[in-house]
Structure formats: C-alpha cells, structure tokens
C-alpha cells in the first residue's frame, strides 16, 4: 500500500485518512482528532504511511492500544526504502521512542513478528548513536516468547570432538557463490577448518560451492522458526559444539531468534551485516582492525583481526574480463553509485548535491540500484531527482551481468 501511494501523485494516503479526522479544521495536520473506537484506530494505522504529513502522538496511541501501536512502529521501520525526509524522520523518532515501550511487550503473539528482522536490520541505516537499542528490546521480547513456548537452552558443558578437533557450528542466512556473504566470509571459514571441525547449517539454497566450505553440511529442517531452532539445537547437541558462529545476522528470523539462545559455550558473530546484536548470548564479534571506528558501537567483545585477515573472493557471477575505458578531459564526469535502496538517505543525497554544486566540471550521477523495481522504482527515482534533477539517472534493479 505504501509503495502504491508513494509512487503516485498522492505520495501518501492522508486524503483518505481525513475521512476519520474529527477536527472541523482539516487543514491542520498537527491537530488530527481520531475517535477511540478500535476499528478506527486499526484503519488509521493501516493507512498511516511513512510519507504521511500527519503528526501522531505515539504516547496517546500506546495508552489506547500498546500492541497496535507496536505493530504500527514495526510497519514504519520495515520498508527497504526509507530515505525521504518524512520517512527517515519517522523511523528516527521511533528508534528513540520505541525501545523502552517494546521491552514491555510480553511476547510476539500480537505484533507482526514476521517482519521482526526488518526492525532488527534496518535500524542500522539511521544516524543516531543509539540507533541499535531497539535490538536489545526486541531481543528481550523474543527471549520471553521462546521461554513461554517451552524453549530450553542446550547443556553446553557437554562438548565433543570430530577428527580430533573441537566443533564449530555455523548458522547461515544467505550463503551461495553469488551472494555477498560467500564472497566476504567463505575463505576465513575454510581456513578455520585447520583448527575446527566445521558444520554448516542453512537452507536448501546453499549451493555446492557454499556447502564445500564445510566439513559437514545440514539443511535446516522445520516449518517455522521454533522448529528450526529445535533442529539447530539437536545438531549442536549431537556434535558437542564448542563454538556457535553466525557470519551474518539480521537477514533472517532464524538467526535473530538463535542469537537469543544458548547453543554453545562460545557464541560469535561476524560483520556479514555490519552491526552489533545487543544480545546477552553473543560474546564476541569478529572484525578486521581497520573496520573498527569505535568499540562503543558494539555490545560484544571485539576479536580484532589484522587488516585483510578475512580476504574476499569474487562473485560467481562476476565477469571474467572488464574493459576499462578512460576518457581524458570529458565534458561530463560520470559518477557511478552502486547501492541497494535501504542505503540511501537524505544526508547522502545532500552531500551529492553539494558535490555537484561545488564541482568545477559538470558531473552526472548514475545510480545502479538494487531492490528498486516495479512500483518502488518511481518512488526511488523521484527522491533522487528531488536533489539532483537531471544530473542523475536512476537505473532499476537488474540481473547481475547487466548491472
């Protein structure tokens, strides 16, 4: 619904929401009056979109219906594209207000838990120092939810060995030869096999190259997150895992739920998605030394590795040969920007606008966009051109070879 309105001349659904406005002065969107009937609240929340110009009193909405308010906050953080001033400021406001409230929610039964990973991951793209605090609150709710469902942690005093080595169980989110996590973390895990017996656990999309990284690979079985966690715990118990490792966390619900359990005496993440977990069950984060801006960014203890200790490999889809064409003294300097939609924000576009305005030569920005397709693309393109006008071209999502 959000993308349909955002890509249209309407931009938002405020004209529809005015139907529910009890204030005779409908021009003042900062003084929107809504009756307290739950049906009206639900309809309002469905059509209150990231681009809305209506000011919402979150405290008042929380007092009326905490779980409905929490659901709205989940929804406003979930889009992959939150870059305009309106949408970005809404998420920023929620990230400051919501964590304390979210921590009081008893479980996930009456909130949209299926988009929890969006709440978890997308906070990284805000700019506030405390932007990840929402994870700590979400982790508390997830932990309570699991315990209420009968979850028990693994007895991690029972350790085993395979081929004379301690066992490291690795939970994968996305891991195949054309995915970025394979490119960034496969070589270091292959090297880890010198000292550990590596058991990979992931979905059936892990290809032959991905499975070959490990001494042993298991497809994670289960019809829901909890059953998958049970299967994961069973693998850890049978192997006597000493280390539980997640090279990435935030793209999949299973990994986020697993980060709130005890499956091994030592539990570690890496920066496959470059952000802290705020989990009580993750002891360490593996990071190359030159990636550490400030240790204050992490709730975990840092295992700081030398620069280039985690060498990358090319994507399986990368071309074998690239012809580089240097244009001397061009009339227009073309600047390519590769980005998924979630990484765009008003600060970045303002910086590009300043570059264009201050440059001594004419520049043109070419945005090669990931996840910008269908009804989303006109919305993204309008945002980019609102800063750069005809000095930018926004290309929709394309297959890797075309990109």
Give the positions of each predicted feature.
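Alpha-helical solenoid repeat scaffolds of the TPR/TPR-like class and their adjacent stem/linker regions
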Residues: 1-331
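Conserved active-site histidine-acidic residue motif and adjacent donor-binding/catalytic loop
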Residues: 223-231, 392-403
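Conserved catalytic-core segment of nucleotide-activated headgroup transferases in glycan assembly
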Residues: 176-197, 307-400
């Amino acid at each position: 619904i959000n993308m349909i309105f955002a890509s249209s001349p309407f931009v938002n659904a405020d004209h529809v929401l005015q139907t529910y406005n009890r204030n005779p002065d409908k021009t003042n969107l900062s003084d929107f009056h809504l009756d307290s009937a739950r049906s009206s609240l639900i309809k309002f929340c469905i059509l209150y979109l990231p681009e809305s110009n209506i000011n919402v009193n979150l405290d008042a909405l929380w007092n009326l219906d905490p779980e409905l308010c929490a659901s709205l906050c989940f929804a406003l953080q979930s889009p992959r594209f939150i870059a305009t001033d309106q949408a970005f400021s809404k998420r920023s406001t929620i990230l400051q207000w919501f964590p304390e409230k979210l921590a009081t929610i008893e479980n996930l039964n009456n909130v949209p838990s299926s988009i929890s990973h969006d709440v978890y991951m997308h906070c990284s793209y805000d700019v506030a120092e405390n932007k990840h605090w929402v994870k700590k609150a979400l982790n508390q709710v997830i932990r309570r939810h699991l315990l209420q469902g009968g979850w028990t942690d693994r007895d991690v005093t029972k350790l085993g060995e395979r081929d004379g080595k301690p066992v490291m169980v690795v939970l994968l989110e996305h891991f195949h030869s054309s995915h970025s996590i394979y490119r960034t973390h496969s070589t270091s895990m292959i090297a880890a096999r010198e000292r550990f017996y590596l058991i990979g656990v992931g979905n059936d999309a892990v290809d032959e190259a991905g499975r070959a990284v490990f001494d042993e690979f298991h497809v994670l079985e289960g019809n829901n997150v909890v059953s998958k966690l049970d299967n994961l715990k069973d693998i850890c118990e049978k192997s006597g895992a000493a280390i539980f490792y997640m090279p990435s966390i935030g793209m999949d619900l299973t990994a986020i739920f697993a980060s709130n359990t005890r499956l091994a005496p030592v539990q570690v993440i890496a920066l496959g998605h470059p952000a802290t977990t705020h989990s009580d069950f993750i002891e360490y984060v593996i990071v190359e030394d030159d990636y550490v801006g400030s240790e204050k960014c992490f709730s975990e203890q840092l295992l700081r590795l030398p620069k280039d200790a985690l060498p990358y490999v090319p994507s399986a889809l990368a071309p074998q040969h690239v012809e580089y064409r240097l244009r001397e003294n061009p009339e227009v300097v073309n600047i390519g920007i590769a980005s998924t939609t979630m990484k765009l924000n008003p600060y970045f576009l303002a910086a590009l606008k300043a570059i264009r305005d201050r440059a001594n030569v004419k520049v043109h920005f070419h945005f090669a966009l990931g996840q910008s397709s269908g009804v989303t693309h006109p919305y993204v393109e309008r945002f980019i051109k609102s800063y750069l006008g005809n000095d930018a071209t926004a290309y929709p999502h394309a297959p890797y070879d075309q990109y």
